[in-house]
A protein has these predicted regions:
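Extreme N-terminal starter segment of soluble prokaryotic enzymes
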Residues: 1-5
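Short acidic/histidine-rich motifs immediately flanking catalytic phosphotransfer sites
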Residues: 38-47
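Cysteine-nucleophile active-site neighborhood
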Residues: 49-119, 195
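Short acidic low-complexity segments
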Residues: 29-39
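Divalent-cation-assisted or electrostatically stabilized phosphate/pyrophosphate-binding catalytic cores
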Residues: 17
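Amide-donor transfer/coupling interface in amidating biosynthetic enzymes
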Residues: 105-205
Length: 205
């Protein structure tokens, strides 16, 4: 039976994503080995904490090559820090290389508002894509972050939000997607987006 793999590298909110996919009825597996990732119909890379720690944890897990391969071949979604890891580098704590799947870098949000941004904020969808299908512009989703992406290619920017400055909320390029917000914590809107992602994988309910 086909399934969606949730990458377990020791730095992600695995269970909330797993439970949400279960709720939606999509087969999924916690993936702590490369073969589970390689055999998946789609892959989700969650992430919490600091960028350098997450990249080090991914390296130590031995899953980096499987993740890179999956991101080039099948529907792939990075969530929160997992989205940030898709980019080339971050200056959180210290300059650190990312996965380099998207050009650009991660920097602290320059805003007069309190950091981290915690709570609900509206999406301004700039470039509709498969994951935003059926969503109304201005839909609210749930954020928890202090750093944001600066995509080098504006065409990769799918949606933004306003937090005293324009903050990239979603990126998309081909089969590759990233959500700075947490779809698994974003109510009906988040459920719809994860359903849309699951449809791309063709995993049966």
């Amino acid at each position: 039976m086909s399934y969606i793999a949730i990458v377990d590298y020791g730095a992600g909110n695995l269970m909330s994503v797993h439970n949400t996919l279960d709720y939606l009825g999509y087969e999924n597996k916690i993936a702590a080995s490369a073969d589970v990732i390689e055999n998946a119909a789609g892959v989700i890379l969650p992430g919490v904490g600091a960028f350098p720690d997450a990249m080090a944890a991914l390296t130590d897990s031995g899953l980096t090559e499987a993740v890179l391969k999956a991101a080039k071949e099948k529907p792939f979604l990075g969530i929160c820090l997992g989205m940030q890891m898709l980019f080339e580098e971050s200056d959180e704590v210290r300059l650190c290389r990312g996965l380099g799947l998207l050009p650009g870098r991660i920097e602290r949000i320059e805003t007069s508002l309190k950091l981290p941004q915690i709570g609900w904020n509206a999406l301004d969808i700039l470039r509709p894509n498969a994951m935003t299908e059926g969503l109304e512009n201005g839909s609210y989703v749930y954020f928890v972050h202090s750093f944001m992406a600066h995509p080098a290619d504006e065409n990769d920017l799918a949606a933004v939000t306003d937090y005293g400055t324009r903050v990239p909320a979603m990126v998309a390029r081909g089969n590759l997607f990233g959500c700075q917000f947490h779809p698994e914590k974003s109510g009906e809107v988040g459920l719809a987006m994860l359903h849309n992602f699951a449809k791309l994988t063709e995993v049966e309910k």
